[in-house]
Amino acid sequence: MQAVLQSAHSSRRLMLLLSMLLNAAIQPRSIIVSATDDVANVSPCEMESLINQLMSPSPEYQLHASALRNQLKNLLRERQLAVGEEQPLGEYPDYLEEDKRSVAALAAQGLLNAPKRSLATLAKNGQLPTAEPGEDYGDADSGEPSEQKRYIGSLARAGGLMTYGKRNVGTLARDFQLPIPNGKRNIATMARLQSAPSTHRDPKRNVAAVARYNSQHGHIQRAGAEKRNLGALKSSPVHGVQQKREDEEMLLPAAAPDYADPMQSYWWYPSYAGYADLDWNDYRRAEKRFLGRVLPPTRATASTHRSRL
């Protein structure tokens, strides 16, 4: 049994080897085209077979077919120029280079006008536009700096800045090149100092600071009016305790006022005949303020009395 399996396996290897040899012998004969250097001697059948192979190649020969397609296009163009019948190839979509979409692929085939695309390569070859050593930085006609320099570092290296190449505010302050000689390096502080008068202090931006600043410079007579806190107003010498002590003292009686007896109102309410015997001075002096105490008992119910208690 093992011998049969080994013989079958060896026969399969032989069949695979024979098929590979047949493919290698037949494939080149179908691809090779007997073309000579003279393009006029190419037969139409050979041209058609060549075009078919170029237009529909196998995926593994895609790059090679693209190169052959470009070569065929160049041959057709040379033939038209030699005959004198120049015909634009753009009408035929088969000859368009739609497969070339990468700049690197176009540059590799020499289809770009400028093969150098890298700034580093152009700089190494000396192809970058540079100014001459004796050429002025500014434009001679307009008197203004050239618009080619847009970077602050380039302007500083070329001497186009007004501060001798210094670009840092801290460096300018250390070198005493700032317009304000007090060493201020903050842009907001510089702007405030430039806008303020020379004899004036720093402008106060806080309400409390403004109030203190005004009270210290010629506004002492209005010191009491500038108080904003009730406690400060109460303890101030103008509006506080001393002002109360300066007023005339009012003497209060030592004993309590002689008010009428509150129970007296209940005595005369049931009988209205004793109005003439009442002392109206005592009644007015009592000044009843509670409605339940003023109304007669007949109109004030027991429930209202309980709620008031």
Swiss-Prot record:
Subcellular localization: Secreted
Residue ranges, compositional bias (Acidic residues): 133-144
Residues the record lists as Asparagine amide modifications: N182
Signal peptide per UniProt: 1-28
GO biological process: neuropeptide signaling pathway; receptor guanylyl cyclase signaling pathway
Domain of life: Eukaryota
Keywords, alphabetical: Amidation, Cleavage on pair of basic residues, Neuropeptide, Secreted, Signal
Propeptide: 29-99
Location (main, coarse): secreted
Tissue: MTYamide peptide: Expressed in the larval CNS (at protein level). NAP peptide: Expressed in the larval CNS (at protein level). IPNamide peptide: Expressed in the ventral ganglion of the third larval instar and adult brain (at protein level).
Record protein name field: Neuropeptide-like 1
Lineage: Eukaryota, Metazoa, Ecdysozoa, Arthropoda, Hexapoda
